Amino acid sequence: ASLFDGRGAGIDKDGNAEVESLRVRSYMQVMELIINRMRAMDGDLALTEGDNIESVEEVTDAEGHVSYKLHLKQQWEGYYTAQAVGNVLKGVINTLAQGSGTYYTSWMLLKDVDTATNTITVDLYPDDETPAGKNFPPCDMMNIIRWGNNIDPKMQSCIYLSSTEGVIKKLIHVTKPILDEGNDGFIIGNLPEWLTKDPSVPVDEGDDAVYVKTLLY
């Protein structure tokens, strides 16, 4: 039996019981009470360095080049960001629930880190170097994550779980916002178009599958 998907009732030979519900009219005595909670996730979850932008300062140099100085939120006392120079940053803002109607993605290249003030300086990627063909500046309350890095190979991978895409994926060799087939390390769930369109792959679009770049056995 399973705590989450079992049915009916049962007691095994060791005296472990599972039931759908239990009513006790007088009292219940137990040695230890363990409460299991189920945690739900909506949207996307990335296993990588992440921060929240507290405020944004636009900086223009003598040549007219615009950068953005991001003041990051302190997550606890003494916190400083783990972001590093060369990081490809993906930022998402969604305030639709608050009624402001703001929802967009920002792609940035990290140019400087100041851990003393917990600030970073970033440049925006050009529109034609982003997946949607349109980029947006960072803003207050935006969540940012390291997508990859254009300098350090050790920082060019991350794992993300997406309830919107229906996939668990490890990205590898990520040096820019736009991904290609060489950036997929493993995939569980919905396969990308480059795999579903391959006539040698026996799956249709929308089928659940497992893809691994290298399998050792």
Regions found by a protein language model. Name each.
Residues 1, 69-75, 85-92, 119-122, ...:
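Short, hydrophobic/proline-enriched secondary-structure or compact coil segments at domain edges
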Residues 1, 19, 24-62:
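Glycine-rich, low-complexity segments
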Residues 1-35, 166-168, 172-173, 177-180, ...:
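Low-complexity, small-hydrophobic/phenylalanine-enriched stretches
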Residues 11-14, 55-69, 112-119, 162-164, ...:
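Short, ordered beta-strand-loop transition motifs
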Residues 16, 144-166, 191:
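Extended, well-structured beta-strand/loop surface patches
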Residues 73-152:
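Ser/Thr/Gly-rich low-complexity blocks that favor extended beta-strand/coil architectures
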